[in-house]
C-alpha cells in the first residue's frame, strides 16, 4: 500500500539541455522565416514571357498617343473648355500598360494610379490639355453640388502621416486646413464644389476616390462598355456615372 501511495517522480531535464532545445527551436523558426521570405522574393522575380502581339499592341498604343498629342497642337479648338464650368471630375477607366511616357506621367500627375479612381480637377487651360492628352483612358465631366457632396460624404478620405483617415472628424479638417479658412466638412465640400484660391491645397488633402465597380463587370468588356459608356468627355452626364459608381 505504501508503494502504491508513493508519487511517481517526474524525471528532470537538465538545464543545459533545455537551453539547447530552446536555442534549436529559435534557430528553426528563423530558418523557416528566411525560407518564406526567399520564396516570396523568388516568386516576385519570376520572368514574365510576353507574346509578340503584346509588343505590337503597345507600339500601336504609343503611336496613337503620339498622333493624338500632335493633333492637339495643330488644332487649338480641341483645347478649349467645352462649357463654362469651374470644376471637373475625372475617372480612370482603362489600364495604361504600354502607353506613351507622356500619357503615363499625366495619369500619375492627376493622381489616378488605380483603375476606377477619381479626382476633382479645377478647370483651367492647363488641366484641359492634360485631360485631352489622356482622354482615351479616362472619362470626365462637370459634377454638380449634389455629386460633390455625396462623393465626399461617402468616400472622402485624407492622407495624414502616410495613413488614410476617413473624413469623420471636423477637428482633423480644422487642424490641417484651418489656415485656409476650412474648419469643417461643409467648408471642405464648398471649397471643392466652388473652386477658390485654396482649391489646390484642399484637393491635395483628399485621397483619390476609389469607386465601386463589380469585378465580374470588368471581365465582360462589351457589357461593361454598354453600361458605363466609353472614355472621354461627357459633360453633365458625369453625374449619372457618379451615382452609378458611388
Curated annotation (Swiss-Prot):
GO terms for cellular component: cytosol; nucleolus; ribonucleoprotein complex; ribosome. It holds the Pfam family Ribosomal_L30_N. SUPFAM superfamilies: Ribosomal protein L30p/L7e. The keyword Chaperone does not apply. The modification Phosphoserine is found at residue 54. One of its GO terms (biological process) is blastocyst formation. Keywords: Phosphoprotein, Ribonucleoprotein, Ribosomal protein. The keyword Phosphoprotein applies. GO terms for molecular function: RNA binding; structural constituent of ribosome. Belongs to the universal ribosomal protein uL30 family. This is Large ribosomal subunit protein uL30-like 1. It comes from Mus musculus (Mouse).
